[in-house]
Amino acid sequence: MSRLYAIILIALVFNVIMTIMPDMKVEAVSCEDCPPHCATKDQRAKCENDKCVCEPK
């Protein structure tokens, strides 16, 4: 029975992590590729410390 609880707990933690990850603003996209990358998300492109940051319009 404890294995079942462990599996359910792992599934819940995985679900929370997968929900949070896409919301991260800084992504590993170079500044040259930033405008087209953010355009696919309908967001404004901005470069900070040589990293692409997509901000809401």
Swiss-Prot record:
Tissue expression profile of the protein: Expressed by the venom gland.
Stretch forming the signal peptide: 1-28
Listed InterPro entries: Scorpion_toxin-like_sf, Toxin_alpha-KTx_8/9
One GO CC annotation: extracellular region
Keywords: Disulfide bond, Ion channel impairing toxin, Potassium channel impairing toxin, Secreted, Signal, Toxin, Voltage-gated potassium channel impairing toxin
Protein location: Secreted
Chief location of this protein within or outside the cell: secreted
Pfam families cross-referenced by the UniProt entry: Toxin_6 (PF05453)
Cystine bridges: 31-47, 34-52, 38-54
GO molecular function list: ion channel inhibitor activity; potassium channel regulator activity; toxin activity
UniProt keyword Hydrolase present: no
TM region positions: none
Free-text note on domains in this protein's UniProt record: Has the structural arrangement of an alpha-helix connected to a beta-sheet by disulfide bonds (CSalpha/beta).
Family: Belongs to the short scorpion toxin superfamily. Potassium channel inhibitor family. Alpha-KTx 08 subfamily.
Name of the protein described by the UniProt record: Potassium channel toxin alpha-KTx 8.7
Lineage: Eukaryota, Metazoa, Ecdysozoa, Arthropoda, Chelicerata
